[in-house]
């Protein structure tokens, strides 16, 4: 599904003494089946933007189009949009409540009025999609699982609704490095195998550089930069630091080496690219 955001502004407590503008004239377009990384410092407007994309918040002004649906139209029934646009919020495991994993994942599809056989098929398929064996996990309590496994169950509950767009707000928050890598690999697989449009909010610049096809950088409620990871990081490294954001570690290394006089390209995002550049410099100096 394509998403078009036009001149979106959101003011909390509008008209009140403590009014606060969280989004300021935001505009962008996301193509069908894109993988978008949404980055920005705390308070940049990322979470507020996410809540607009399936109608959880209404804008103060502006429009959002999901395919041909203007979801800011007051006369539009948002139920159909929310079936198509799934949102996984921060710490989604806190939303788990059923006594078994099977029942928890089935909760959403059950509210769609589906046949029991279809609900079963969706639960089984979504568990397998997130790497949980159905027979091995279906009767377990979600509260017996590790943090990473709980996160997988929560994501499966959204996938079971068969959304065309999956939005994830800091899905690895609070996980150890192993759990974080598992979730990022899962999201990558969902994008590749299910052809979903993915919008991923994260503070991990290294993972964003590897996963996302498009980056949207938010700053004080506005879109600061938008482009491919290579375009955004290569052209705006110093500006990103100025607004409180990191850059990928391999690019940081390249910039440090350039400061020391090494002729290292700034167009580096992966470890393999960094290795090749360093080898080129070493060989050029006759060191190997």
UniProtKB/Swiss-Prot annotation:
Pfam families from the UniProt entry: ABC_tran (PF00005)
Reading the lineage from the top rank, the first entry is Bacteria
Q: What is its EC number?
A: 7.-.-.-
Tell me if Protein transport is a UniProt keyword of this record.
Answer: no
UniProt entry keywords in alphabetical sequence: ATP-binding, Cell membrane, Membrane, Nucleotide-binding, Translocase, Transport
Q: Which GO terms describe its cellular component?
A: ATP-binding cassette (ABC) transporter complex
Question: Molecular function (GO) terms listed?
Answer: ATP binding; ATP hydrolysis activity; ATPase-coupled transmembrane transporter activity
SUPFAM superfamilies for this protein: P-loop containing nucleoside triphosphate hydrolases (SSF52540)
Q: Which PROSITE patterns match?
A: ABC_TRANSPORTER_1, ABC_TRANSPORTER_2, CBIO
What topology does the record note for this protein and the membrane? Peripheral membrane protein
Residue span, ABC transporter domain: 3-245
Q: Per the annotation, which location comes first and is thus the protein's main one?
A: membrane
Q: Where is the protein found, in the record's own terms?
A: Cell membrane
Q: What class of enzyme is it?
A: translocase
What InterPro entries does the record tag this protein with?
Answer: AAA+_ATPase, ABC_transporter-like_ATP-bd, ABC_transporter-like_CS, ABC_transpr_CbiO/EcfA_su, ECF_ABC_transporter_ATP-bd, EcfA2, P-loop_NTPase
Functional summary from the UniProt entry: ATP-binding (A) component of a common energy-coupling factor (ECF) ABC-transporter complex. Unlike classic ABC transporters this ECF transporter provides the energy necessary to transport a number of different substrates.
User: Assembly state and interactors?
Assistant: Forms a stable energy-coupling factor (ECF) transporter complex composed of 2 membrane-embedded substrate-binding proteins (S component), 2 ATP-binding proteins (A component) and 2 transmembrane proteins (T component).
The entry sums up its family as follows: Belongs to the ABC transporter superfamily. Energy-coupling factor EcfA family.
Protein name per the record: Energy-coupling factor transporter ATP-binding protein EcfA2
Species this protein is from? Clostridioides difficile (strain 630)
């Amino acid at each position: 599904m394509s998403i078009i955001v036009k001149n979106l502004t959101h003011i909390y407590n509008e008209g009140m003494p403590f009014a606060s503008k969280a989004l300021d004239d935001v505009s962008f377009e996301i193509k069908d089946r894109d993988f978008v990384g949404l980055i920005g410092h705390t308070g940049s407007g990322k979470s507020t933007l996410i809540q607009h994309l399936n109608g959880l918040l209404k804008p103060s002004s502006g429009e959002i189009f999901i395919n041909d649906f203007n979801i800011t139209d007051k006369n539009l029934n948002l139920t159909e949009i929310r079936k198509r646009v799934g949102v996984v919020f921060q710490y989604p495991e806190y939303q788990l409540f059923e006594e078994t994993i099977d029942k928890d994942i089935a909760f959403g599809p059950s509210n769609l009025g589906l046949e029991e056989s279809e609900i079963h098929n969706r639960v089984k398929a979504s568990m397998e999609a997130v790497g949980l064996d159905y027979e091995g996990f279906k009767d377990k309590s979600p509260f017996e699982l590790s943090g990473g496994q709980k996160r997988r169950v929560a994501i499966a509950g959204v996938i079971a609704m068969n959304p065309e767009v999956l939005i994830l707000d800091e899905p690895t928050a609070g996980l150890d490095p192993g759990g974080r890598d598992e979730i990022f690999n899962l999201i990558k697989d969902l994008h590749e195998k299910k052809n979903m449009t993915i919008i991923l909010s994260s503070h991990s610049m290294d993972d964003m550089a590897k996963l996302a096809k498009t980056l949207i950088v938010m700053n004080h409620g506005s879109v600061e930069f938008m482009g491919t990871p290579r375009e955004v990081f290569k052209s705006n490294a110093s500006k990103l630091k100025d607004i409180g954001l990191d850059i990928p570690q391999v690019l940081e290394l390249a910039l440090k080496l350039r400061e020391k006089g090494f002729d290292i390209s700034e167009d580096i995002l992966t470890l393999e690219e960094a290795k090749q550049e360093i080898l080129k410099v070493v060989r050029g100096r006759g060191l190997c």
